UniProtKB/Swiss-Prot annotation:
Name of the molecule in the record: tRNA/tmRNA (uracil-C(5))-methyltransferase
Binding residues annotated for S-adenosyl-L-methionine, in chain numbering: 183, 211, 216, 232, 294
Record-level GO BP terms: tRNA methylation
Family: Belongs to the class I-like SAM-binding methyltransferase superfamily. RNA M5U methyltransferase family. TrmA subfamily.
Function according to Swiss-Prot or TrEMBL: Dual-specificity methyltransferase that catalyzes the formation of 5-methyluridine at position 54 (m5U54) in all tRNAs, and that of position 341 (m5U341) in tmRNA (transfer-mRNA).
Cellular component GO terms, alphabetical: cytosol
A molecular function GO annotation: tRNA (uracil(54)-C5)-methyltransferase activity, S-adenosyl methionine-dependent
EC annotation from Swiss-Prot or TrEMBL: 2.1.1.-, 2.1.1.35
Taxonomic source organism: Acinetobacter baumannii (strain SDF)
């Protein structure tokens, strides 16, 4: 481990250990990231000069207003497949004005399973000639391509990739859609999935999952429970989760298109939802013992926190230590922290991903 990686990780460990000490958690489990080639996503502006074109990012100046263009020829934190493709793709784009004209941005989405989706974003309308050129490029480089312009989306192949993780002695396939959220650090994501499954070990009754996304945690966790009800509001994520459940031949998961707040209303009988009836979901038929939450950066709202306090076990994955800290002030009134983990999902940034298991006092 290099000193620069160790230092940034230690700073996160110190911060988390100090911040959460008042909850007397057990020893912090630390899950490191690879030091290079860990990001499965990368987004670059395309910078055009009189006789050149290159990938670029922007660096803010000290005043926070002005930005400096930084040329990017390689990007060591991105997956090796992205780094390998970058110069090949750029050479092809430069050689064909149909593909390079008014090209504004290039986004890469890679997988450990070897698939690659490249999104080309333009400041012009895309025509049939562009589509033919993009098809030839996709074939030549063995990638999927998507062209975007205002009000336009042209898909060459698919607008998604399929990731594959080995876990719990089996393989899990995940549909990852270009515009939807996915965990960017696949190696650390696998460690998070394993940790969550370990935290669920010995659970009885059924699992409720709020904010399930594309079913990232839902699929492996389903092996630890008799029945699972997962909720998610974003339509594209719900469709991806249902595809993932079907592709992985898992038959004990139901997905409800509800927000956490809406689920609370339905669970407490305050409101009926046609969406539940249409999906043939009877919430009252579940006997929940464990709830799994992976909320957005804003954390969990007060009503949902009250709901969580009624469960025997809470597995909480957090992408924001500050909102986790605030939420734990409420949850530790009824539960104690029995597992505590740090996942270095975003090395070399201040972002910290963490996990806690809470069990009823």
């Amino acid at each position: 481990m290099t000193s620069s990686y160790r230092q940034q990780l230690q700073a996160k460990i110190d911060r988390i250990t100090t911040q959460f000490s008042e909850f007397t958690p057990p020893t912090l489990e630390v899950f490191e990231s690879p030091e290079q080639h860990f990001r499965m996503r990368a987004e670059f502006r395309i910078w055009h000069t009189e006789n050149d074109m290159f990938y670029a990012m922007f660096e803010r100046n000290d005043d926070g207003k002005q930005k400096t263009v930084v040329r990017i020829d390689e990007f060591p934190i991105a997956d090796k497949s992205i780094n390998d493709l970058m110069p090949l793709l750029l050479a092809e784009l430069k050689a064909n004005s149909l593909l390079s004209q008014r090209l504004f941005e290039v986004d890469f989405l890679a997988t450990l399973s070897g698939e690659m989706l490249v999104t080309l974003i333009y400041h012009r309308k895309l025509n049939q000639e562009w589509e033919q050129a993009a098809k030839a490029l996709a074939e030549k480089l063995n990638i999927k391509i998507m062209g975007r312009s205002r009000g336009q989306k042209i898909v060459i192949g698919d607008d998604f990739v399929v990731e594959e993780f080995e876990l719990l002695n089996r393989s899990f396939k995940y549909k990852q859609i270009e515009s939807s959220f996915t965990q960017p650090n696949a190696q650390v994501c696998k460690k998070m999935l394993q940790w969550a499954c370990d935290a669920a070990e010995g659970s009885k009754k059924h699992l409720l999952e709020l904010y399930c996304g594309n079913g990232n945690f839902t699929l492996p966790l389903s092996l630890k429970f008799e029945r699972v009800l997962a909720t998610e509001l974003a339509k594209s994520s719900v469709y991806a989760a249902q595809w993932n459940i079907e592709q992985n031949q898992i038959d004990n998961i139901q997905v409800a298109r509800l927000s956490a707040e809406e689920f609370t209303q339905a669970y407490q009988g305050e409101r009926e939802f046609r969406r539940l009836q249409e999906a043939d979901i009877d919430i009252q038929s579940y006997d929940f013992g464990t709830v799994f939450v992976d909320p957005p950066r804003a954390g969990i709202d007060d009503e949902t926190l009250k709901l969580l306090q009624g469960f025997e076990r809470i597995i909480y994955i957090s992408c924001n230590p500050d909102t986790l800290y605030e939420n734990l002030k409420t949850l530790t009134q009824t539960h104690r922290v029995t597992k505590f983990a740090l996942f270095d999902q975003f090395p070399y940034t201040h972002h910290v991903e963490s996990g806690v298991l809470l069990e009823k006092i």
